[in-house]
Amino acid sequence: MRILANLILLGVLFGVCLCQGCGDSDDDGQDDCTGDCGDGDFDGVDDCTGNCGDSDGDGYDDCNDDDSQGAYTYPYGRYLYGRRFGLRRFGNPFFRFRRFGFGPVGGLNFRLGGFGYPYGGYGNLLSRFRGYGGYGNLLGGIRGYGNVLGGYGNVLGGYGNMLGGYGNILGGYGNMLGGYGNLGGYRGYGYQLRGYGGYGSFPDNYGRYSVGSYLRRRRRKKY
């Protein structure tokens, strides 16, 4: 019985130790030992959870895949292409914590280009050549769909615009220096040094390392 009583006493003491409070230094009404860090940003969510507020007022917490500098800028991105259609980010190595997004310079809802951004939007800063100069470009020019220098969220490429093609950082459907829409280009699908997606070479109009070049070589073999 004595052993049992001692065990019960130890259990009670251990429980008291576990439940001992650590204070509420953040005045959030919850004990600090529970992991609560307060709500310094007054966004209604405890700061320990990764919430950092919504200083840009775009409806997304700045810690959670947001940049606190106006992700969905009024009026276009925030209301037309913000949470309503779920267009957030489309994957870019330039931005950490971006599940989706074309990146810091270009793309849908981005800082320097895309659908509705501080330097982008429906026909913006320098993109109004011919009256329909791109859905939000800084220099995205003659027709582009939203970038710094053109394209669907690209630095130097994009959907039929100043420097070519559907685009990526330097061109293409997910290509660095080639593909549909590249540096150089002739608008439309864009030609990286006259090639449908590759590092390009002038002689054959397709690009030495491109799909077009490969198809052309195959056609040559048939004759």
UniProtKB/Swiss-Prot annotation:
Subcellular location: Secreted
Chief location category: secreted
Tissue specificity field: Prismatic layer of shell (at protein level).
Secretion signal, residue range per the UniProt entry: 1-19
GO cellular component: extracellular region
Protein known as: Shematrin-like protein 2
Alphabetical keyword list: Secreted, Signal
